[in-house]
Swiss-Prot record:
Belongs to the UPF0179 family. This is UPF0179 protein Mpal_0949. It comes from the Archaea.
Length: 148
């Protein structure tokens, strides 16, 4: 398996700590006039990231209290449920996010934070059976997904 490449971005200095996981939500209107906005907004909207390390560089920021801090990040794996027949380690899948039964106990794992509709992921590990049953009666497996 290929090693995950890290990249440098800027996040709020008060948030910056190793291990922090976050979902990038996109650029804010307040960022339009910022001279370092490209460094802050160099991530993919909806993706989940994890901070590996913090750099000493801090920039003034109209969005974040105490400025924006340079951090090294990687895309973070997501844990979710997929159809059992797709749960094969190292396979590439397109997660099915079509279920609308939000009252189902499995719904949050069928729609994990950081999984973007229409994008492909690699099943990095099959973790086991679904912790709860599916209201639609589907056979599901709990897996770890990595963006590709």
């Amino acid at each position: 398996m290929a090693e995950i490449k890290s990249k440098v971005t800027l996040i709020g200095a008060m948030l910056a700590r190793p291990g922090l996981e976050f979902i990038y939500e996109g650029e804010l209107p307040a960022c339009e006039q910022c001279k370092v906005r490209k460094a802050c907004n160099n991530l993919k909207v909806g993706r989940k990231y994890r901070v590996l390390s913090i750099r000493a560089t801090v920039h003034g920021c109209s969005v974040h209290l105490n400025g924006a801090c340079a951090v090294e990040i990687v895309e973070s794996p997501m844990v979710g449920l997929i159809k059992a027949d797709l749960a094969i380690a190292n396979s590439r899948i397109l997660p099915d996010l079509s279920c609308t039964q939000s009252e189902c106990k499995s719904y949050p794992l069928c729609h994990p934070d950081g999984v973007v509709s229409g994008e492909r992921y690699m099943v990095s590990e099959v973790l086991g059976n679904a912790p709860d049953h599916c209201d639609k009666g589907r056979s599901l497996k709990l897996v770890e997904l990595l963006p590709i």
